[in-house]
Amino acid sequence: MIFSMLRKLPKVTCRDVLPEIRAICIEEIGCWMQSYSTSFLTDSYLKYIGWTLHDKHREVRVKCVKALKGLYGNRDLTARLELFTGRFKDWMVSMIVDREYSVAVEAVRLLILILKLFYPECEIRTMGGREQRQSPGAQRTFFQLLLSFFVESKLHDHAAYLVDNLWDCAGTQLKDWEGLTSLLLEKDQSTCHMEPGPGTFHLLG
């Protein structure tokens, strides 16, 4: 009986008029999906996270992205996210230019996680005691995504804040000086159609 009640709970609480209730609901659904994946990590429940990605309240959107980070971060669960990824990938990408900076930063972190998941060659592997970078193309994709977010957000005075927030989850990519130098030397910047702002080189450096 209790389990039956829990299964019906998200349908009500995800649409609650109070954003605090919606945020708590999404956070708990994410936990349930990780702990009881057989029962809750299904399209019937994933859709609630997908729908609330565009909730009008910042905290709800943040909880959604964090819940997804927990799911995509568990390789044992990612196979069940295939349909969700195909359905909501465009929306997840669009969140990197969210009007709320905290949401945008979490969205970038999520996409970095997904990038590493589907393009494992972008990770740094250690061979013979020396770090060797794999697939420059994957590194390039990461930087293009990050620079697109930085330019489109028009927050050029906050590059240091962005780097600080991404350092723990993408420190190895941010320290890819060779890749960064290659982007800086390009004549045709495919990631944007405007001159870099005053903080762009601080972001890259």
Swiss-Prot record:
Keyword Nucleus found: yes
Pfam family for this entry, one: HEAT_SCC3-SA
InterPro entries in the record: ARM-like, ARM-type_fold, Cohesin_Scc3/SA, HEAT_SCC3-SA, SCD
Main location: nucleus
GO cellular component labels: nucleus
Record localization: Nucleus
Domain SCD: 10-95
Keyword set, alphabetical order: Nucleus
Keyword Cell wall biogenesis/degradation carried by entry: no
Transmembrane segments: none
Family recorded in the similarity comment: Belongs to the SCC3 family.
Protein name from the UniProt record: Putative STAG3-like protein 1
Lineage, top ranks: Eukaryota, Metazoa, Chordata, Craniata, Vertebrata
